[in-house]
Regions:
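Two-component/phosphorelay signaling modules centered on CheY-like receiver
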Residues: 11-32
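CheY-like receiver
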Residues: 41-112
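Short hydrophobic/Thr-rich beta-strand motif most characteristic of the beta2 strand and flanking loop
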Residues: 25-35, 43, 91
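Non-catalytic signal-transmission and effector/linker regions of two-component phosphorelay proteins
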Residues: 1-3
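Generic detector of well-ordered alpha-helical packing
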Residues: 9-11, 56
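Conserved sequence signature across two-component system core domains
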Residues: 7-8, 34, 52
């Protein structure tokens, strides 16, 4: 079973991702949801995800900083940045920090 962490301060985004994952993978995946970067880090410690989808712009700690801390806890976590920011510098920084990909919202089902 894969554990997937979803972190975004917009509930509609996490709800949609959760729905897509559950419909596509059923019992093969378990999800946990965070509404802030700090909560994502806390969940990463206890939930120990295999995969994480992180928004960049969240209250408190942003997704890039959260990714850095999460990968410090477990370098094997596959992190995908999910954002509305079409910013080359953000994308470059995300990849430098170890993100698997930089996905632009809205993300279609096939990308997940």
């Amino acid at each position: 079973m894969y554990k997937i962490l979803l972190a975004d301060d917009e509930g509609i985004v996490t709800d949609s991702l959760q729905f897509i994952i559950e419909k596509s993978f059923g019992d093969e995946c378990e999800t946990a949801v965070a509404k802030s970067g700090r909560k994502a880090i806390e969940l990463a410690e206890t939930f120990q995800p295999d995969i994480a989808f992180l928004d960049i712009q969240m209250p408190g700690i942003n997704g890039l900083k959260a990714m850095e801390e999460i990968r410090g806890l477990n370098p094997k976590v596959k992190v995908f940045i999910l954002t509305a920011y079409d910013n080359f510098e953000y994308a470059k920084e995300a990849l430098r920090l170890g993100a698997v990909d930089y996905l632009m919202k809205p993300v279609n089902k096939k990308m997940i």
